């Protein structure tokens, strides 16, 4: 039986698990939990600047630390679990020190570190592996970073993305494949939406190149801006563009579809299936409210 999967994030009053304390808990996955700790030690200036939780807010919204830990352990349960976190050594140190102070035992935990996973999968040093930086690269709606529930949700999403790209790397890691990279380009052709899609597409291509440095990536979706900004978006033009993409795809060794399929991606998947070109799926980016679907 597969162990339940959770993602955990702590906001803390400092960096030392033996001197500082947990100020906020965020847990998502098989079951969710979130709470502020009302009686945590005072936050260091750096910690306060990051999480923005004032002592007054903690007292007003929080619960005593012993109660919060008890509720967290109740949600985790007594059976073995998998716990995803971005920088596992940090959160693990605080959880173990907290449980030791309260005299409670923890369930068996398989720690999964998305920071380590991202560094191993994509060793390119020019790509930041910070949680916020990766969320921006992938175009995810983040809300308020450095709040526990938000960061836990992002860590879980990153874990799922890393799993997808590990699978792609296993299948395309040999040789020097030419890979067609497709993303959910949408919008009404205005310059703002065009540039947004273009930036997302090339940020994703840089990530893919960091994972598969020996591959050559074809990114036609990133070039649609030059056509769209000219104002020519008639049906005939669109059909000709898709046909050109299909011809290009036929010369590639693989297709990677990123995100919720757009009409163009559905067409490209059909071309790949008809031509026997292997295709793979990976998460894409979130579309902002001002882009029409």
PLM regions and their residue ranges:
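Acidic two-metal-ion nuclease catalytic site recognized across multiple nuclease folds
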Residues: 1-3, 137, 156-176
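Conserved non-catalytic scaffold segment of RNase H-like nuclease domains
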Residues: 1-108, 125-146
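Anionic group-transfer/hydrolysis microenvironments
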Residues: 11-13, 26, 87-88, 115, ...
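Short hydrophobic/aromatic-enriched beta-strand-loop microsegments
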Residues: 105-112, 279-281
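Short alpha-helix plus adjacent loop in nuclease-associated cores
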Residues: 112-129
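Acidic, divalent-metal-coordinating active-site segment for phosphoryl/phosphodiester hydrolysis
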Residues: 147-160, 267-271
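Conserved catalytic or regulatory cores that recognize and/or transform ribose-phosphate-containing ligands
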Residues: 170-293
């Amino acid at each position: 039986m597969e162990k339940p999967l959770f993602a955990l994030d702590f906001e803390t009053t400092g960096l030392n698990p033996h001197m500082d304390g947990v100020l906020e808990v965020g847990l998502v996955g098989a079951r969710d939990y979130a709470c502020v700790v009302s009686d945590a030690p005072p936050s260091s200036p750096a910690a306060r600047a990051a999480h923005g939780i004032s002592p007054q807010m903690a007292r007003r919204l929080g619960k005593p630390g012993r109660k919060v830990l008890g509720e967290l352990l109740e949600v985790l349960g007594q059976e073995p679990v998998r716990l995803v976190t971005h920088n596992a050594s940090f959160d693990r140190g605080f959880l173990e020190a907290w449980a030791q102070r309260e005299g409670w035992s923890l369930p068996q935990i398989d720690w999964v570190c998305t920071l380590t996973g991202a560094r191993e999968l994509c060793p390119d040093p020019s790509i930041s592996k910070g949680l916020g930086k990766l969320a921006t690269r992938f175009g995810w709606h983040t809300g308020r970073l450095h709040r526990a529930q938000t960061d836990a949700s992002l860590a879980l999403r990153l874990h799922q993305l890393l799993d997808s790209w590990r699978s792609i790397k296993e299948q395309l890691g040999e040789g020097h494949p030419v890979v067609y990279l497709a993303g959910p380009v949408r919008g009404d052709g205005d310059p703002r939406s065009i540039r947004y899609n273009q930036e997302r597409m090339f940020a994703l291509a840089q990530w893919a190149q960091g994972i598969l440095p020996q591959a050559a990536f074809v990114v036609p979706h990133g070039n649609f801006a030059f056509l769209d900004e000219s104002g020519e978006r008639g049906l005939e033009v669109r059909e000709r563009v898709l046909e050109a993409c299909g011809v290009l795809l036929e010369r590639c060794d693989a297709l990677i579809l990123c995100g919720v399929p757009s009409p163009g991606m559905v067409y490209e998947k059909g071309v790949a299936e008809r031509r026997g070109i292997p295709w793979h799926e990976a998460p894409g980016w979130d579309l902002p409210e001002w882009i029409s679907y």
